[in-house]
Amino acid sequence: VLAFDYLIAPNTGLGYVLGAVQLTAAALTAYTAVRLLMGARPMTLPERRAEPDKTADAGGGALTCAAEKRARDELLHPQDHRMHLRGRDFAIMGALTLAYSVAAFWHLGATKAPQTGYVSTAAGETVVLDLGENQEDFHLYYYGGISDTQFTVATSVDGESYGVETGAFFDRGECFKWLALREPTYDADGVAAGASGGMIALNGRYVRLTFDGAGSALWEVAAVDGNGRVIPVQAIAASGAVEGRAADPNALIDEQDTVPEKPTYENSMYFDEIYHARTGYEHAHSLHTYETTHPPLGKVFMSWCIDLMGMTPFAWRFAGTLTGILMIPAIYLLAMQLIKRTRWAALSALLLTADCMHFTQTRIATIDSFPVLFMMVMFLFMARWMQMSFYHQKLWKTLVPLFASGVFMGLAIASKWIGCYGAVGLAVLFFSRFITLYKQSVYAKRHRDEDPAFARAADGFAKKGAATLAACVVFFVIVPIVIYCLSYIPYLSAYGEVKLNLKTLERIWNAQVTMFEYHKNLVATHYFSSPWYEWPLIVKPMWYYSAAFPAMGKASTIMAFGNPAVWWTGLAAILFVLGYSVYRNALPMLRVTRGRDDEYDRALPIIAVGFLSAYLPWVLVSRLTFIYHYFASVPFIILATAQGLRYLERRNRALSHALTAVLVVAAVALFIAFYPYASGLEVSREWLARMNWFKNWMWY
């Protein structure tokens, strides 16, 4: 197992067996979670029954003795839906959020990048740079936008006789990157297929760029000496452009202050930024988008930052990074809503702060961070509603968290379709609680004369229940659809003025069909792909970036993976949470009665349903999957960890606190140790090798 040499392919026989086991366990867990939410007590052994279950026909329902007692207890003693936030809670949230913000924004990306450029209009069009005098052993850097063609480079001493033309590879996948003229690589047929060799050392006074065709969008070109210093361009001229359409070649050298010492992730796009951040740029300029395989909202957020700060690495990563920062208070509030203890809310926030996946995935300009935050918040508001009751609070007050949950559900789905997975979890939680409220009304009708609270519940369910269901149609159907459609406004603006008509709706619908067909028919292979059952164990981290030109003896890399202390502990914790649900409800013969922890049991199924809704659908996905698809499950395994330690605290306080301290120290220490892998910080290869714990684990 530790060699990680097994089950790399997601379609192995054992993978199917594990999938079947997972589905069976999940079905049983979902059943027991629903029973918990609906107010069921653990079943009792036959010999312990004093008498058969009592039933009643009043109200058209029948309740067991245990369910009657639960209904009576909550009608007389409603749940506490408040978080009980105090000054120290805000202080802890603020401190953790501030600390994480500093780490997240440090070396996030350059705040300067070329903003203007030169677009070729014809094949054979040339631009000549005059460096003023003959230069030796210099390199050529270039930065481009969205381009369709390539160009070649040649140098000359006198401006008349040029040397061999060298291809400067530059295509759609190389947009918004600083690139260096490098030695070409060749395919099996001897055809140049890329450039991954060392930088080419150039000599001469004149540098000529010759474009292969129209549409090559270069935003800046620079000659750089061996020490990384920019060599000033004394003059520049262009020829061969289509008459009347020639661009100003000075746009190629007008932002030389943006030229970096060397290309790195800090000044260039990497991994899927070439799709998502590029689409943000296209939205900002009302262009037709290249990437249409996911809903647009996350890319719209990026476009807003690009509008405000320009097309720079810092700008296109800002929205995702801010989202990662907001996850810290979000999980703190979610933990307080569920557990209502500062200690465990602080632990939850700290573990998320120290998680490597959270750090890496929110600093890259992809869309995955947005739905995760929105899913956390939509579960937060649903949990709040579940702790309320329209028997005890005014109806409109109970509808507020439902409305908020629906809004964030819409935002999650409009960011990425994984929000639909979470929506299923919300539905399970909502209807389970709604049925519980119905059961309470059944009990109240039979005992309405015993207490005014029973009379209110007996008379109130029909009207308030119907109003709640009607409101939920608006909150969880109409509102999300409206949000989803509104998120397409920037996409539609590329076609002209956006109007509400059948053509607009048809375009939105066709975009959904295109998305669905893409994911349904996707057939691809990838060395770093991994099946769902490997993610919790961090079997195969996902490689995002390696520096092309690191210093001698050093390396810079970015990998997506979890903090072992957080994920491996979280795996044990979520198994405990799922297993404990079964233990409390389906295995009574093993249960030793020691009293009941109501707050624990009410929080437990919410965590279980949240985790299963984020994770379980991936068991059924046959397409290529990666470890970052586990990201949405991470908040729930962290909450499970806090719940598990809290459960232990009730039985052995000293042991619980000792394990908590060990976990905190381990999580922080491992985050620091793995920080170079998570951040791209250039460090010695020796350190990276030391942290490469298993065979074929990390990449640098």
Regions found by a protein language model. Name each.
Residues L2-L37, R41-R49, D53, D57-I92, ...:
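Transmembrane helical bundles and short interhelical boundary loops of multi-pass, membrane-embedded
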Residues V102-C175, E183-Y270:
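Aromatic, loop-rich ligand-recognition surfaces of beta-strand-rich domains
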Residues R229-G280, F461, I481-I538, R685-N692:
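Aromatic-rich transmembrane-lumenal/periplasmic boundary elements in polytopic membrane proteins
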Residues F314, F318-I339, V377-F381, Y580:
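Transmembrane-helix motifs of polytopic, lipid-linked glycan transferases
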Residues W316, G320, M357-F370, S415-I418:
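Short acidic/glycine- and proline-prone juxtamembrane loop motifs at membrane-interface regions
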Residues I331-A354, V372-L373, Y391-K397:
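Transmembrane-helix signature of polytopic, membrane-embedded enzymes
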Residues S348-T353, T360, L380, M409, ...:
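Short helix- or helix-capping micro-motifs
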Residues M378-P401, A412, F431-S441:
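Membrane-interface transmembrane helices that cradle and orient dolichyl/undecaprenyl
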